[in-house]
């Protein structure tokens, strides 16, 4: 008798994606982040759903409804902090996942990579609108500053901003629509993630060597299911350490002050995972230029397959490219630090140099280095 899991219309899909899927025998822990992102998404949707049961998206009651969740709802505090810190874990996994793709040349799977970049943008949009919902000072001013960037678009900018706001400033209409966006976007992310997986399974996974592994495949279950479970346990451990011991470590104290349009906080800054992009935005003294640099800093990922000049796919056997990659990582950490600093000497110049270096490494140094490596190997 043929196994039901191989014939049943629904179980067949699950079977081909998670059980009998042929996987390379040598994928390292860097390949765990895909499943971890899936777990993060499920966790965020579940905690978010329970928060939405008690949250009110009205300027008069939003802040106090979040306080009510933390004080009066059974285990509301843990749900709230799991959701807030879950977003941080989500972005840690995202950055690791993208970094893995860059290092091992996974961007040569064009459809998978491009859907991934769209996913990154969507997750960033979701996190941004979500940060506005508690209606604290940083929520309000963050929303004001970031949405205001759209006014840099020539001709239609001002109209566009007022259309997004639903008025002449960030107010009740803005909060209500941001809640609606924040509710719907995770489901769009889930759908996109399925498409991402669909395209990945057309080609099969890459592996650390970047060499086709068709000759040496193993079934996904039990080898990688057990490996993923270990990754999930570590993720949950790290998340719960954060939630139970330092829930406000990554948050901004200003967000414990209710939103006040008459009082601007001294330093407006987004959550830590946006600081690198915020630093790039601030490093350009022109508004439109800053916005373009901000968008380019993420959109540049789409160019990665075009900028790949090496005859090898992975960086595993390319020491010079490896050095550049880790310099890029250090540069991004520098930008993250600068994004959280006030706009004054020496931070301005450090931010500008780090921003220039970021684009210079990706657009100039990496392709040149790859070509040099080809020549050294007489390829």
Curated annotation (Swiss-Prot):
Its cofactor is heme b. InterPro entries: Cyt_b/b6_C, Cyt_b/b6_C_sf, Cyt_b/b6_N, Cytb/b6-like_sf, Cytochrome_b, Cytochrome_b_C_euk/bac, Cytochrome_b_N_euk/bac, Di-haem_cyt_TM. The chain crosses the membrane at residues 33-53, 77-98, 113-133, 178-198, 226-246, 288-308, 320-340, 347-367. It comes from the Eukaryota. Keywords: Electron transport, Heme, Iron, Membrane, Metal-binding, Mitochondrion, Mitochondrion inner membrane, Respiratory chain, Transmembrane, Transmembrane helix, Transport, Ubiquinone. It is found in: Mitochondrion inner membrane. Pfam families: Cytochrom_B_C (PF00032), Cytochrome_B (PF00033). GO terms for cellular component: mitochondrial inner membrane; respiratory chain complex III. Binds 2 heme b groups non-covalently. One of its GO terms (molecular function) is metal ion binding. Disulfide bonds: none annotated. Heme b b566 binds at residues 97, 196. Heme b b562 binds at residues 83, 182. A ubiquinone binds at residue 201. It is a multi-pass membrane protein. Its main location: mitochondrion. Component of the ubiquinol-cytochrome c reductase complex (complex III or cytochrome b-c1 complex) that is part of the mitochondrial respiratory chain. The b-c1 complex mediates electron transfer from ubiquinol to cytochrome c. Contributes to the generation of a proton gradient across the mitochondrial membrane that is then used for ATP synthesis. Heme 1 (or BL or b562) is low-potential and absorbs at about 562 nm, and heme 2 (or BH or b566) is high-potential and absorbs at about 566 nm. The cytochrome bc1 complex contains 11 subunits: 3 respiratory subunits (MT-CYB, CYC1 and UQCRFS1), 2 core proteins (UQCRC1 and UQCRC2) and 6 low-molecular weight proteins (UQCRH/QCR6, UQCRB/QCR7, UQCRQ/QCR8, UQCR10/QCR9, UQCR11/QCR10 and a cleavage product of UQCRFS1). This cytochrome bc1 complex then forms a dimer. Belongs to the cytochrome b family. This is Cytochrome b. The lineage of its organism: Eukaryota, Metazoa, Chordata, Craniata, Vertebrata.
